[in-house]
A protein has these predicted regions:
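Conserved catalytic core of the tyrosine transesterase superfamily
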Residues: 1-198
Length: 198
């Protein structure tokens, strides 16, 4: 079994596809999507309430734990659609009107950590991920994906709510793409300096 501690973007997509057609598919898909895209810890995810969302403006308020910085993130179009789909289905669940928590169980109570863990673990198994999947891997997947896309370390730090940049550096340190073009850029500078000397 691999020691990798994060999921790739493709693995997360496979997990979302694996859950989307089950009896709780709308909820599970939305849960995995938001956890991944916003790099949420499981407690932050399960503490989300409808008052934290503004679907019209496309924003989500992330209340970070562990003394992290809380932030407002943009909600992308597919995230809004996933929340809307889940909200429509959720309204038909027994006891759904008793709580404002976004993610609830079939009994209408807020989803527990154990239930969320099981959903994510089972989605990983169903998707055939190369490593045993748990909720925090979605947070790491977010950080690594942002680094892979060229996001600055400080921006990733803010996005994930890290107080200490040491926790963020792991994502950018292993990203070889950050060195792409380094020699070409330096060559251009050297060429410019040579032309100015002449």
């Amino acid at each position: 079994m691999s020691k990798r501690r994060y999921l790739t973007g493709k693995e997360v997509q496979a997990m979302m596809q694996a859950v989307c057609y089950g009896a709780t598919g709308a909820r599970d898909y939305c849960l995995i999507l938001l956890a991944y895209r916003h790099g949420m810890r499981i407690s932050e995810l399960l503490d989300l309430h409808y008052q934290d969302l503004d679907l019209n403006e496309g924003r989500i308020n992330i209340r970070r734990l562990k003394n992290g910085f809380s932030t407002v993130h943009p909600l992308r179009f597919d995230e809004r659609k996933a929340v809307e789909r889940w909200t429509l289905e959720r309204a038909n669940w027994k006891g759904a009107d008793r709580t404002d928590a976004i993610f609830i169980s079939r009994r209408g109570s807020r989803l527990s950590r154990q239930q969320a863990y099981r959903i994510i673990r089972d989605a990983g198994i169903e998707a055939g991920t190369v490593t045993q999947t748990h909720p925090h891997m979605l947070r790491h997947a977010c950080g690594y994906e942002l680094a892979e896309r060229g996001a600055d370390t400080r921006l990733i730090q803010d996005y994930l709510g890290h107080r200490n940049i040491r926790h963020t550096v792991r994502y950018t340190a292993s990203n070889a793409a950050r060195f792409a073009g380094l020699w070409e850029r330096n060559n251009l500078i050297n060429e410019k300096l040579k032309r100015e000397e002449v």
